């Protein structure tokens, strides 16, 4: 049992709170003033800020090893590969997980890259553990889809389709139609006691998307690709997030309409790269969060690790605040907004009794880049403690 005392809480249910947190059995047991227990270890957070553990809403952590040429995030054998599963490639010993813990990041949504049009299943994982199966918060968390430069350029190099944006959308539509036909064949065989169709792992992986149990996680940068993503998703009435959404500030009315229908959120980032990427030429960097906020569009900020180091997630939010985004909104983008958009807010994203005890303690305002992460707690266990707390 742990009790965190004397800190300034930023619970994400209100802007700030002066109270203690009791942790028991890996969960937040209580948030009240003057908590005590004979059996509890006490953490004195005087002068510190206490937040929910930070959430990286789009990452490839564990699939791209820091400092290594190994890359397990893209499979170039087929542009339609929804059956791929991130958990089969995540390396818990990737040193980026330690970097995440040292910066207060407790959950990452990690998965396949953007080479394939439909690239496989993302997973929400905690950033501590030795076996990925023990780190899972939600699996699968989403199915990756990608539009734009990456799929057509990579497959053009192999003299294969897609070679154009038209082909990208067409191939995705065909895959979703195949999945519908596969579902219909299963339902018909069950209804008539007939023979089941041969098992198809790719189509099977898309069934939860068609039933709206799982969202598509759609990689998009250009405004026209954003429009195509919305168009195709609405044609098949599937849920989705728009990830990166680099030119989203140019089509805010489209985004607002999409959020009313099937889009469950916008995930922006990385905010510190892509300087040489043609389709991100209109990138507005740290002004992007403010542009969406001013239009009333909720969003999360991601690192897109390996593109940005995961330990810079908080820095990206803080630099967005420096561009005029209210600090509280910046923190929401890497806590509760990230949790809501990725479908894990029942477990993480805010400091509430009953939620997972994933907590970060900072030396000062977390939206001040000079503040340091002092302690990180995951599932009630201290997984990082700064050696010099001053």
Q: What is the predicted function of each stretch?
A:
Residues 66, 71-76, 81-84, 215, ...:
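His/Asp/Glu-enriched, well-ordered alpha-helical/loop segment
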Residues 5-11, 340, 352-390:
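C-terminal cap of metal-dependent C-N hydrolases
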Residues 7, 21, 26, 47, ...:
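Divalent metal-coordination and catalytic microenvironments
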């Amino acid at each position: 049992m742990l009790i965190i005392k004397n800190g300034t809480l930023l619970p994400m249910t209100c802007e700030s709170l002066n109270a203690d947190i009791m942790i028991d059995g890996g969960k937040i047991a209580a948030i009240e003033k003057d908590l005590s227990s004979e059996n509890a270890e006490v953490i004195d957070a005087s002068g510190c800020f206490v937040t929910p553990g930070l959430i990286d809403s789009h990452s490839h952590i564990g699939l791209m090893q820091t400092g290594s040429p190994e890359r397990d995030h893209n499979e170039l054998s087929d542009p339609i590969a929804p059956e791929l599963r991130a958990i089969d490639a995540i390396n818990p010993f990737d040193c980026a997980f330690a970097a995440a813990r040292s910066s207060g990041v407790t959950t990452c949504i990690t998965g396949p890259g953007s080479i394939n049009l439909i690239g496989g299943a993302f997973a929400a994982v905690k950033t501590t553990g030795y076996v990925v199966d023990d780190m899972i918060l939600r699996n699968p968390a989403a199915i990756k889809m990608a539009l734009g430069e990456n799929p057509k350029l990579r497959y053009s190099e192999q003299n294969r389709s897609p070679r154009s944006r038209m082909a990208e959308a067409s191939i995705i539509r065909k895959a979703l139609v195949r999945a519908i036909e596969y579902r219909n064949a299963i339902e018909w065989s069950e209804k008539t006691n007939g023979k089941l169709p041969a098992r198809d792992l790719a189509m099977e992986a898309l069934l939860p998307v068609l039933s709206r149990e799982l969202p598509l996680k759609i990689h998009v940068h250009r405004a026209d690709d954003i429009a195509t993503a919305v168009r195709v998703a609405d044609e098949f009435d599937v849920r989705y997030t728009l990830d990166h959404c680099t030119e989203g500030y140019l089509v805010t009315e489209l985004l607002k309409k999409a959020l009313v229908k099937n889009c469950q959120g916008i995930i922006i980032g990385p905010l510190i790269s892509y300087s040489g990427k043609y389709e991100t030429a209109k990138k507005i960097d740290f002004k992007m969060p403010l542009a969406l906020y001013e239009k009333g569009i909720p969003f999360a900020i991601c690192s897109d690790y390996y593109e940005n180091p995961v330990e810079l997630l908080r820095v990206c939010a803080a630099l967005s605040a420096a561009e005029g985004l209210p600090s509280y909104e910046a923190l929401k983008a890497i806590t509760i907004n990230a949790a809501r958009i990725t479908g894990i807010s029942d477990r993480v994203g805010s400091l509430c009794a009953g939620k997972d005890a994933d907590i970060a303690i900072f030396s000062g305002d977390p939206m001040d880049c000079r503040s340091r992460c002092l302690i990180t707690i995951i599932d009630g266990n201290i997984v990082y403690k700064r050696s010099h707390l001053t």
